[in-house]
Amino acid sequence: MTGVCGCCGALRPRYKRLVDNIFPEDPEDGLVKANMEKLTFYALSAPEKLDRIGAYLSERLSRDVARHRYGYVCIAMEALDQLLMACHCQSINLFVESFLKMVRKLLEADKPNLQILGTNSFVKFANIEEDTPSYHRSYDFFVSRFSEMCHSGYEDPDIRTKIRMAGIKGLQGVVRKTVNDELQANIWDPQHMDKIVPSLLFNLQSGEGTESRSPSPLQASEKEKESPAELTERCFRELLGRAAYGNIKNAVTPVLMHLDNHSLWEGKTFAVRCFKIIMYSIQSQHSHLVIQQLLGHLDANSKSSATVRAGIVEVLLEVAAIAASGSVGPTVLEVFNTLLRHLRLSVDYELTGSYDCTNIGTKIIKEHEERQLQEAVIRTIGSFANTLPTYQRSEVMLFIMGKVPIPGLHPTLPSIGSGPEGNRMIQVMLLKSLRQVTCGFQTTNMLTALPNSFLDPMLSFALLEDAEIRLLVLEILVSLIDRHDNLPKFSNISIISDISVLKLKVDKCSRQDNLFMKKHAQHLYRHIYLCSKEQSSVQPHFEKLYSLLALISMELANEEVVVDLIRVALALQDLALSSEEMLPVYNRCAIHALSSAYLNLISQLTTVPAFCQHVHEVIEMRQKEIPYLLPEDVFIENPKIPKTLEKLEGDVLFQQAKITEVLGGSGYNTERLATPYVPQFTDEDRLSKRKSIGETISLQVEVDSRNSPEKEERTPAEEITFETLKNAIVDSVGVEEQEKERRRQVVEKFQKAPFEEIAAHCGARATMLQSKLNQIFEITIRPPPSPSGTITSSYGQTQSRSVPVYEMKFPDLCVY
């Protein structure tokens, strides 16, 4: 009966007649608008008929596609679009299944125009917000098909571009339709992200070549909307902008895999561009998740080529610069630990020539590539540090210092076949990292920012024989002390006639700075002095020493510090004159030049006219007679120094007595000024330069002697007068010499004395200790006093006697 009714138009259902009437006899005439309005009114009046209308339209479209009547196909899709836009949200579910079935039919067609037509209809549908949830709708086919269209390889370039853009728009529509609908299949699942993200990256990468051709402004404006790369970037940003906290990993992982599979880390440019898009698109509080994934990927590629690892590190460098301050994540030190570990691995790879000590030669390692990687890691460490607040940067500095192998303090790190040279390279690389972290580091409280646990090992490095390490330490110290950006003004050593042209920034020394200098000043002075006398020091070392002296004068100086700095400068002059020190001629001239340049600076900072005049006179005399003792002739490319240095005296030297006299008139401590500066040698010196077991033993003996009970006995209070203090200051030099001689004898004894003598000495000390312990026990472990009193032994010693209670004699009043 149904078939018979279908043959007679009047007997057919109304919705079919309305659908048939929208199709003209000639498809070129287009949709019959009057009949389309009737169909739309009918659909709105009877929404329960929507599913039947959709099914019938789908049936007609399938038939027209099979018969290649593409004009009617376009009319059917136009009608579907209009019905879709006109329907109410509550009733749209009745119509969508038929609509998606028709879109799927078009996307499966071989004709590019039909694929593009279906995609455009799907995009219109995706922009409709639905109130009614759909439980059974699936978009898996559309994700796969649109991703496939993004990789289209059609022969005609224009058609290929249109197909790819249609695929990108389709993916954008899928994301919009599903990303906020929890009842849909989760678009963030890896099975979907592994298709969507690589498709977008493929088109983003393909657009790089066309963008680099620099078209004319007219062409650019015309094609701006048609660029697949532009559309891809917009879609990619929208996808990432919708990503919640738990979806970041699934969105970033395909990016990492795509860059791995297509070897795009080595070029760096595209990888950096991708992650810039990611970082600027996601929410700022999620930035640390991207950083953690990059660090994990770096660990996974620990045995990849240096160029791949360097590419990942370069991306980390850019990402760290974009990440908001403090958003590196809860495990800040873990970030630096990972980077330092890869720095260590790179050093081992460079020295051993293999990624695996068991398979030497499995891969060819290029040293220059490993060096580039190391520099990239160091820059990245600095970039991460710049995003941290001051207190966290101090923690990072301590953390890095704890990784540095320091003889006697921190054990050397286990090395994979690299040996001592590996430890040295690690020291250099970690100190370079530390230098990057300290760049721009400014703190108001030096005492808390630079604790002993950081400063002591740092200063011990200044005494190592390695010139490169000493220079790095000086650069770090200078960077830490410079808080007002005065360092560039002291980068070169020169005699400045008027320091006002430098426009120095000087603040009054704070209480915290005074406490810092009170605690650490002597250590700093001693290391400046000892570093100056190192024979391997060259021009950069002296320039950094000058900067260090100048910055201490600017940042941390009070009246006492100024006096001590002048004493140090005069001690450097005496060091250059000393015949005991076997210094080369260049070093002697350089020390003289350093001393003269600094005294010229400090004299103008103190603003004492007589002091400035004396320094000026000495410099003028040197310019006339011995210019090779001034910086202008020493610190140049070809130093103008003699082969031998004659004995210097008279007006060409700075006179301590004269300086003491002129500064004393301005209220400075003349007694302190008159006392020559002599550095105190401490245990730290031996820790940094220890070479023999004898020195180790001598250090232990000194510690024992300082802690012995004999030293702890109280002495009667001594009356302190002005004369006593004066004599103590005058005699301090002799005491220091005696202490130095005593230490030399101890070292010599343990180096040359036979083992039996050393053992006997230690045995005697053990016997003495035991006797002292016996005395202490005898005093502390005594029986309680007895009411019966004491008895006297034949040796005259009193002994306590225990008397039974019944034998005790009590007073009469106590007995009942």
UniProtKB/Swiss-Prot annotation:
Pfam families documented for this protein: EFR3_ARM
Function: Component of a complex required to localize phosphatidylinositol 4-kinase (PI4K) to the plasma membrane. The complex acts as a regulator of phosphatidylinositol 4-phosphate (PtdIns(4)P) synthesis. In the complex, efr3b probably acts as the membrane-anchoring component.
Swiss-Prot/TrEMBL keywords: Cell membrane, Lipoprotein, Membrane, Palmitate
Record text on subunit structure and interactions: Component of a phosphatidylinositol 4-kinase (PI4K) complex.
Entry-linked PANTHER family: PROTEIN EFR3 HOMOLOG B (PTHR12444:SF4), PROTEIN EFR3 HOMOLOG CMP44E (PTHR12444)
Name of the protein: Protein EFR3 homolog B
Membrane topology type: Lipid-anchor
Main localisation: membrane
InterPro entries found in the cross-reference section: ARM-like, ARM-type_fold, EFR3-like_ARM, EFR3_Homologs
PTM statement from Swiss-Prot or TrEMBL: Palmitoylated at its N-terminus, anchoring the protein to the plasma membrane.
Similarity-based family: Belongs to the EFR3 family.
One GO BP annotation of this record: phosphatidylinositol phosphate biosynthetic process
Positions of region (Disordered): 206-230
Segments of skewed composition (Basic and acidic residues): 221-230
Compartments where found: Cell membrane
Skewed-composition ranges (Polar residues): 206-219
